[in-house]
């Protein structure tokens, strides 16, 4: 069973993939999107879901620190419905508070340049979201 992990931004969609055993998450790519125009990179997601025979999607669900759902969380809820309808696979909304910040700290600690960090931060956040979900299962 393969699971896809996603980190939704306004301009990019970070993508991670579980191994077949469901133990580890690996970053796949960052898809350029345009949330304002409703372009969520669905054609590329379709390819990934078909190529890897995806059984489930874990989508980062950003909540405010007090647990309430703000505008970004609402965007994730809307996107989750689009994914479920389009691909007919279950979508799990996973609390992603601070994952992007944690990913950035890891990249800074690894001395990754600001330019390179910008390219991989969403993919790294998707890995952290998916790995958190996988760890909760095992």
From Swiss-Prot:
Q: Where in the cell is it found?
A: Cytoplasm
Keyword line: Cytoplasm, Hydrolase, Nuclease, Ribosome biogenesis
Molecular function terms, GO-annotated: nuclease activity
On the tree of life, the source organism's domain of life is Bacteria
NCBIfam families in the cross-refs: RNAse_H_YqgF
Give the protein's function: Could be a nuclease involved in processing of the 5'-end of pre-16S rRNA.
UniProt protein name = Putative pre-16S rRNA nuclease
Q: Which gene encodes it?
A: yrrK
